[in-house]
Design a protein with these regions (language model features):
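Short glycine/proline- and aromatic-enriched beta-strand/turn motifs that initiate or cap beta-hairpins
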Residues: 18-66, 200-214
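Sec-dependent N-terminal signal peptides
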Residues: 3-14
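Solvent-exposed loop/turn segments connecting transmembrane beta-strands
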Residues: 40-49, 107, 152, 191
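Non-catalytic effector/regulatory segments
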Residues: 25-34, 115, 156-158, 188
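Gram-negative (and chloroplast) outer-membrane scaffold detector with strong preference
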Residues: 55-141, 145-154, 193, 198, ...
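Outer-membrane beta-barrel translocator domains and adjoining extracellular loop/strand segments
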Residues: 40-46, 78-85, 123-131, 169-177, ...
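Predominantly the C-terminal beta-signal and adjacent terminal strand-loop region
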Residues: 140-214
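Serine/proline-rich low-complexity intrinsically disordered segments, especially terminal tails, linkers
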Residues: 6, 17-20, 46, 57, ...
């Protein structure tokens, strides 16, 4: 992760000499690492392994952007935190709408802030579940992205997100029916959520010409 951060800030420095981008319609692909927060049992038992998010958006001249996309995340059960040991995890798939604001502060650096709201299907699988346990919920993810341009049509980004998965995690979610594993009901009261750090690539279909080329 430290190497990735150093690499990203190198891209920012490199991008200071690049051409600016006039956002229009674009496609972004992000790959990241989720870390469970908020719900105490979820934070202790589940380990975030991956989150993936492809999306398409259109940005107006004032920077307001609208988009659609998909989100996938996987949290594995930490078998050392449950008794008896069980193996498995929770797959979450989301289709979302996105509203944000994208602004380029220099020719090579920009930011985007916004929120993704969508419909979530979560599938828990473990040794204690015969088939799978499905949960449907509302997905909400506020985020901020730091963008470094690399050409008139492309950029790289570091995104920090806070996805709320919309369900209350309990041991029953992963098939443990006869024990609270030492947690109280208050520990299950908060919605399962995460803190994510993702790296992404954006392709701008419109790009931008230099002023002397207009």
């Amino acid at each position: 992760m430290k190497f990735s951060l150093v690499f990203f800030f190198y891209l920012i420095i490199f991008s200071l000499s690049s051409q600016s981008i006039d956002p229009d319609d674009s496609f972004t692909f992000e790959l990241g690492l989720p870390n469970a927060i908020n719900n105490k049992a979820y934070r202790s038992i589940m380990q975030g392994l991956v989150c993936i998010s492809p999306s398409y958006q259109y940005a107006l001249k004032n920077g307001i952007s609208f988009g659609v996309g998909l989100h996938y995340s996987y949290f594995a059960i930490n078998e050392y935190r449950v008794q008896p040991k069980i193996f498995g995890g929770i797959h979450s798939a989301v289709a979302f709408l996105k509203l944000g604001h994208e602004k380029f502060w220099t020719e090579g650096f920009g930011t985007e802030t916004g929120c993704k709201i969508g419909y979530l299907n979560s599938f828990a699988l473990s040794d204690s579940i015969k088939n799978y346990r499905r949960t449907e919920a509302t997905f909400i993810e506020p985020f901020i992205s730091f963008i470094a341009t690399s050409s008139v049509n492309s950029s790289y980004r570091l995104t920090i997100g806070f996805p709320f998965y919309g369900f209350n995690f309990t041991p029953e979610t992963i098939g443990i029916l006869d024990s609270n594993l030492g947690y109280s009901n208050a520990d299950f009261s908060k919605i399962a959520s995460a803190f994510t750090i993702s790296f992404g690539y954006t392709f701008y279909f419109n790009g931008k010409k230099n002023p002397d080329e207009d």
